[in-house]
Amino acid sequence: MSAHANHPFHLVDYSPWPLTGAIGAMTTVSGLVQWFHQYTMTLFILGNIITILTMYQWWRDISREGTFQGLHTFPVTIGLRWGMILFIVSEIFFFISFFWAFFHSSLSPTIELGMTWPPVGIIAFNPFQIPLLNTAILLASGVTVTWAHHALMESNHSQATQGLFFTIVLGIYFSILQAYEYIEAPFTIADAVYGSTFYMATGFHGLHVLIGTTFLLICFLRHINFHFSKNHHFGFEAAAWYWHFVDVVWLFLYISIYWWGS
């Protein structure tokens, strides 16, 4: 398809960001493995810096193309919507694998675990302390992001700003409480299959909360610079979908791992 043809599709220009993003991801994971084996964190930090700089530059280009160059036409937006939907579906299956591992281990605990769940020697978290507070925080953030979305659709700039701001604050609050919970935890990822499944599932969810908070922060900065209108705000809509997904996953985590699993 010619770049100069009369069609509504966005044919992207050559970009270095996929390559630098791949280099950043590879460097980050390599550095993480080094860090896990008690080596220096230098490579991990370098990978994070490359990834963050790539994200900034890439998102800047996408914002420019969609907002100022008008390249995100209706057919392009439909494609972006389907892309986001399929991405969230892939993430759902990603978390299903963690739940599968958890229930496989907990419903028929082996002799090595003492044939009980949680395994002998594991002191599980009280589900009615920090985990319950985190549940309330995420549910409240789901309400505030919906408030922001409806305000945006009604062209109410100030209320959309407030809703986004409170959602970001609640996301940061959740991450701080989860970090505190990890620091105070009476077991580690090395403590049998309970520790492995617990930290894998809740840790990856925590990572998704950080990603979602960053996504919403970008939307907040774009919103206060008037990049969104009531008819053209897919970037925000994608962030809201992602946040609701994170919210629902946490409910399943809380009910199965924290409450039932304790």
UniProtKB/Swiss-Prot annotation:
The chain crosses the membrane at residues 39-59, 83-103, 120-140, 163-183, 201-221, 240-260. It catalyses: 4 Fe(II)-[cytochrome c] + O2 + 8 H(+)(in) = 4 Fe(III)-[cytochrome c] + 2 H2O + 4 H(+)(out). GO terms for cellular component: mitochondrial inner membrane. Keywords: Membrane, Mitochondrion, Mitochondrion inner membrane, Translocase, Transmembrane, Transmembrane helix. It comes from the Eukaryota. GO terms for molecular function: cytochrome-c oxidase activity. The keyword Zinc does not apply. It is a multi-pass membrane protein. Pfam families: COX3. It is found in: Mitochondrion inner membrane. One of its GO terms (biological process) is mitochondrial electron transport, cytochrome c to oxygen. InterPro entries: Cyt_c/ubiquinol_Oxase_su3 (IPR024791), Cyt_c_oxase_su3_dom (IPR033945), Cyt_c_oxidase-like_su3 (IPR000298), Cyt_c_oxidase_su3-like_sf (IPR035973), Cyt_c_oxidase_su3_a-hlx (IPR013833). Its EC number is 7.1.1.9. Belongs to the cytochrome c oxidase subunit 3 family. Component of the cytochrome c oxidase, the last enzyme in the mitochondrial electron transport chain which drives oxidative phosphorylation. The respiratory chain contains 3 multisubunit complexes succinate dehydrogenase (complex II, CII), ubiquinol-cytochrome c oxidoreductase (cytochrome b-c1 complex, complex III, CIII) and cytochrome c oxidase (complex IV, CIV), that cooperate to transfer electrons derived from NADH and succinate to molecular oxygen, creating an electrochemical gradient over the inner membrane that drives transmembrane transport and the ATP synthase. Component of the cytochrome c oxidase (complex IV, CIV), a multisubunit enzyme composed of a catalytic core of 3 subunits and several supernumerary subunits. The complex exists as a monomer or a dimer and forms supercomplexes (SCs) in the inner mitochondrial membrane with ubiquinol-cytochrome c oxidoreductase (cytochrome b-c1 complex, complex III, CIII). This is Cytochrome c oxidase subunit 3. It comes from Anopheles quadrimaculatus (Common malaria mosquito). The gene is COIII.
